[in-house]
Amino acid sequence: MKNSETIKKLGLVFPPAPKPLGVYLPTLVVDRFLYVSGHGPLKNDGSLIKGKVGSELDREEGKAAARQVGLTMLSTIINNYGNIDNIKRVVKVLGMVNATP
C-alpha cells in the first residue's frame, strides 16, 4: 500500500506546516536524503501545545502532543514535496519530550 493510501485510510488530519523563518528551514535535501528539521507540537489550528509532561500535561496529553509532532512533520513533507509516496523509508528519528524526571 502506498503511503498516501495509508494516510487516507487512517483519516489523518494535518496541522499547518511551519514556514521557513530566518535560518530555519523545515526541510533540506542532500543527495537523495530528505532531512526534516525539528518540529514542535502544533494543534490543527496552528497554535502550540504547551506544557511539561508530568506537571502541566498528563501522560495522554503528552502522547497526543508527540503524535501532533509526527503529523506536523508529515505535513511539512507533503507541503514541500507534494508526494509522500516518494519516501521509501525512515532512516533516523530523534525524538525529545519535555518531561519531569
What is each model feature region?
Residues M1-P101:
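Short, polar/acidic, helix-capping and beta-turn segments at strand->helix junctions
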